[in-house]
Amino acid sequence: MPLTDPVKLQIVQQRIFLKKVCRDCGALNSVRATKCRRCHSKNLRPKKKELPAKKG
């Protein structure tokens, strides 16, 4: 069921996409993080902003 309400869509996008991913261990961190919460590495990248395509 796709979301049509723009306010709810914006809330969902912020909850899903505003994260950083550790390149060493793959842990999700907050967007303000400078070090990984799990392995304390500084090698973080922003999470990709696209949903993966469905197979099938």
UniProtKB/Swiss-Prot annotation:
A GO molecular-function annotation: structural constituent of ribosome
Family annotation (HAMAP family): Ribosomal_eL40
Pfam families recorded: Ribosomal_L40e
Record NCBIfam families: PRK04136.1
Gene: rpl40e
Organism this protein belongs to: Sulfurisphaera tokodaii (strain DSM 16993 / JCM 10545 / NBRC 100140 / 7) (Sulfolobus tokodaii)
GO biological process, one term: translation
InterPro entries registered for this protein in UniProt: Ribosomal_eL40_arc, Ribosomal_eL40_dom, Ribosomal_eL40_sf, Ribosomal_zn-bd
Alphabetized UniProt keyword annotations: Ribonucleoprotein, Ribosomal protein
Entry's family note: Belongs to the eukaryotic ribosomal protein eL40 family.
PANTHER family recorded: 50S RIBOSOMAL PROTEIN L40E, LARGE RIBOSOMAL SUBUNIT PROTEIN EL40
Protein name: Large ribosomal subunit protein eL40
CC annotations in GO: ribonucleoprotein complex; ribosome
